[in-house]
């Protein structure tokens, strides 16, 4: 990566009053013009990172760089960043125009330029014509758009968003995910988004940092994080997972549930204890005699797009299956899966060790040929 817009170098944070360490030796670099997400549960340290970038908190140790320059001692108003808070922090006694124009008025920008820039900012967030509207008469989604317009009107290098969608209902939250992502692409500004919602992170991000207990546990693209979780925490935090104890017999051969299965993982010691992950959507229901495993259906819930089926094998392991086919409680079904559906996690493997192992065993990445190519390939296989 060349010329990162934001960099953390060995940044730690300890709250002096309690002695609690909330960040532990954080290192990362953010590229300009990307959408980054800090994903983690409450207390993981994600908002602390955001507040240190903004200048609302000081790092206890380490360096924070903006465009290559150390900004640890730079005051908030001198940093080329803007924060959108969860509460939006709008002025209720001001109308939409005055809220969005507030920073420009402080800078004594000419009146005509303020009017033009406010109009353009509101147009970008689909609030054109709302200049005179009272903040108190806006919906939650509209207030959020005003907060974003106020953030982008100064044309900052970085926009920080601290769980801005959490107060919205599900439908509006989904709509705003699309709008935020498209806005970021149009502006080309670096967005740093904080959330505890893994679906938001997967849907919106170019790059995700998964956090736990003040540390970055894993970072990568949404596809990488979902398909190749580095440990038990990530596998359970990102989506649903079936996780079972296993033994890596040798490269590409794993044993679990008393049987041996082909896999696509390697680089581990012979007979090394591992954890095996299979996602619920990767399990296909078959006749019992045709399945690689047999399970008894315990219960199921209809989730709209699929049935969520809970079943147990003869060793007592719980299995979650996502299927468009309805099961019958108490029946025995078969489960089928491919070697590509099996993901192997080493015990206590670091992200650096994981990356080195993957790089050694993956000679080249498959090209992203797109959906149309995938459909054509499937049809070719069906016809051959």
From Swiss-Prot:
InterPro entries (UniProt xref): AAA+_ATPase (IPR003593), ABC_SmlMolc_Importer (IPR050093), ABC_transporter-like_ATP-bd (IPR003439), ABC_transporter-like_CS (IPR017871), Mo/tungstate-bd_C_term_dom (IPR008995), P-loop_NTPase (IPR027417), Transp-assoc_OB_typ2 (IPR013611)
Keywords, ordered alphabetically: ATP-binding, Cell membrane, Membrane, Nucleotide-binding, Translocase, Transport
GO cellular component assignments: ATP-binding cassette (ABC) transporter complex
Membrane topology qualifier: Peripheral membrane protein
Pfam family of the protein (one): TOBE_2
Family: Belongs to the ABC transporter superfamily. Spermidine/putrescine importer (TC 3.A.1.11.1) family.
Assembly mode: The complex is composed of two ATP-binding proteins (PotA), two transmembrane proteins (PotB and PotC) and a solute-binding protein (PotD).
Function of the protein: Part of the ABC transporter complex PotABCD involved in spermidine/putrescine import. Responsible for energy coupling to the transport system.
Protein name: Spermidine/putrescine import ATP-binding protein PotA
The organism of origin for this protein: Streptococcus thermophilus (strain CNRZ 1066)
Gene: potA
């Amino acid at each position: 990566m060349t010329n990162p817009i934001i960099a953390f170098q060995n940044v730690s944070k300890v709250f002096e009053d309690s002695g609690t360490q909330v960040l532990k030796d954080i290192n990362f670099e953010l590229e300009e013009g990307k959408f980054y997400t800090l994903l983690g549960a409450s207390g993981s340290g994600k908002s602390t990172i955001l507040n240190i970038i903004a200048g609302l908190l000081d790092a206890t140790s380490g360096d924070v760089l903006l465009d290559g320059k150390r900004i640890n001692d730079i005051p908030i108003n001198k940093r080329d960043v803007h924060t959108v808070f969860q509460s939006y922090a709008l002025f209720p006694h001001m109308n939409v125009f005055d809220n969005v124009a507030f920073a420009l008025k402080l800078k004594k920008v000419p009146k005509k330029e303020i009017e033009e820039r406010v109009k353009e900012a509101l147009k970008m967030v689909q609030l054109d014509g709302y200049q005179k509207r009272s903040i108190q008469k806006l919906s939650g989604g509209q207030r959020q758009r005003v907060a974003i317009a106020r953030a982008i009107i100064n044309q900052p290098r970085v926009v920080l968003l601290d769980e801005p969608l959490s107060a919205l209902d599900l439908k509006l939250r989904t709509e705003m995910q699309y709008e935020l992502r498209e806005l970021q692409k149009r502006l080309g500004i670096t967005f740093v988004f904080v959330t505890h919602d893994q679906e938001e992170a997967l849907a919106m991000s170019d790059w995700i940092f998964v956090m736990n207990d003040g540390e970055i546990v894993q970072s990568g693209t949404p596809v990488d994080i979902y398909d190749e979780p580095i440990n038990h925490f990530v596998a359970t935090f990102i989506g649903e997972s079936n996780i079972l104890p296993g033994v890596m017999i040798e490269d590409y051969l794993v044993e679990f549930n008393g049987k041996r299965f082909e896999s696509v993982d390697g680089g581990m010691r012979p007979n090394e204890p591992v954890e095996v992950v299979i996602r619920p959507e990767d399990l296909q229901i078959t006749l019992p005699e045709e399945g690689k495993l047999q399970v008894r259906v315990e219960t199921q819930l209809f989730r709209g797009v699929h049935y969520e089926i809970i079943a147990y094998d003869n060793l007592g392991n719980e299995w979650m299956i996502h299927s468009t086919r309805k099961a019958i409680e108490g029946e025995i079904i078969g489960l089928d899966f491919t070697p590509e559906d099996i993901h192997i996690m080493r015990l206590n493997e670091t992200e650096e060790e994981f990356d080195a192992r993957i790089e050694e065993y993956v000679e080249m990445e498959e090209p992203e040929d797109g959906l149309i190519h995938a459909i054509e390939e499937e049809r070719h296989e069906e016809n051959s």
